[in-house]
Amino acid sequence: MWIGIISLFPEMFKAITDFGVTGRAIKQNLLQIECWNPRDFTFDKHHTVDDRPYGGGPGMLMMVQPLRDAIQVAKQVARSEDGVEAKVIYLSPQGRKLDQQGVRELSANRKLILICGRYEGVDERLIQSEVDEEWSIGDYVLTGGELPAMTLIDAIARFVPGVLGKQASALEDSFAEGLLDCPHYTRPEVLDNMPVPQVLMSGNHEQIRKWRLAQSLERTWLRRPELLDSLALTDEQRVLLAKIKQQYKIS
């Protein structure tokens, strides 16, 4: 997978290019990341990349020309190898809120270009002409789009074949099936008088599977019940959830 990044602070992305799962994926050529800095597309001696908004108000906007030129170069690089166009994403609080389903959808793209805004944002006309989709990582404001972009890259990379040592890991993550993850345990068998659940020691894979599913359902119902509203539960899940509610004396 190829990801192009438009950012005034490309150095920030060393956090994902040099470390962890994404860093290994890049070394193995499973993931390719290239950055373009709009400052490199300016023509004045100060490398100006911001300008005042029409209508007044506090703050500045990113200048159109350097940003658009950077996007155009990224698009050209994306299509130069095999003619495949990259989908252009603008990280914005006004965008669709990122969830696991969204991550799956985005991971199906071979090429993405992520635009990281700064200041008070970018000219609306640039969004209309250059951006395919807007995405948000939550209902809060950050100083720039770099951290959301890194979050998006990390989440997407888990679905790139070969990035994880075991592909099942991505399928079993929290939210992979719309449910929160079940509890996990490792050694020692007893920690501060708290033992590992006996079913996990049994070696019975079917019982372990059912226990984990029940735990995921219970956690989701207790902590994020709204997630269940959008799920088409299987017969097994409905039965387990009914038993869980009965245990809490709620029908």
Curated annotation (Swiss-Prot):
GO biological process, one term: tRNA N1-guanine methylation
Gene3D superfamilies xrefs: 3.40.1280.10, tRNA(m1g37)methyltransferase, domain 2
Top-rank taxon: Bacteria
Alphabetical UniProt keywords: Cytoplasm, Methyltransferase, S-adenosyl-L-methionine, Transferase, tRNA processing
Stored CDD domains: TrmD-like
Reactions it catalyzes: guanosine(37) in tRNA + S-adenosyl-L-methionine = N(1)-methylguanosine(37) in tRNA + S-adenosyl-L-homocysteine + H(+)
EC supergroup of this enzyme: transferase
Pfam families: tRNA_m1G_MT (PF01746)
SUPFAM superfamilies referenced in this protein's UniProt entry, alphabetically: alpha/beta knot
Binding positions (S-adenosyl-L-methionine): G117, I137, G138, D139, Y140, V141, L142
Subunit structure: Homodimer.
Purpose: Specifically methylates guanosine-37 in various tRNAs.
Record protein name field: tRNA (guanine-N(1)-)-methyltransferase
Species this chain originates from: Haemophilus ducreyi (strain 35000HP / ATCC 700724)
Name of the gene encoding the protein in the UniProt record: trmD
